[in-house]
Amino acid sequence: MKVALIVCLVWVMAMMELVSCECWSQADCSDGHCCAGSSFSKNCRPYGGDGEQCEPRNKYEVYSTGCPCEENLMCSVINRCQSA
């Protein structure tokens, strides 16, 4: 009985952690992060660094596979951040 209670408690804590990373819009994310993912599972992710996967910035701030690049970097035609 005690083991089941502990397992349930750990599971609830893990679910709370997952929910805290979810986002619905850019406003839900802290500086240096964007809201990206599928319609059903968006998470705050860090902006892309040099050589990392990216999506070009858009006026709707809707991203599916990754975030735009950090400042002073641009998203290339192969969706990788590089020097501007």
Swiss-Prot record:
InterPro entries in the record: Prokineticin_domain (IPR023569)
Disulfide bridge map: C23-C35, C29-C44, C34-C67, C54-C75, C69-C81
UniProt key word RNA-binding: no
Any GO molecular function: toxin activity
Expression (tissue specificity): Expressed by the venom gland.
GO cellular component: extracellular region
Domain of life according to the entry: Eukaryota
Tagged with keyword Disulfide bond: yes
Signal peptide location: 1-21
Protein name: U8-theraphotoxin-Hhn1c 3
Cell location: Secreted
Protein keywords: Disulfide bond, Secreted, Signal, Toxin
Family (UniProt): Belongs to the AVIT (prokineticin) family.
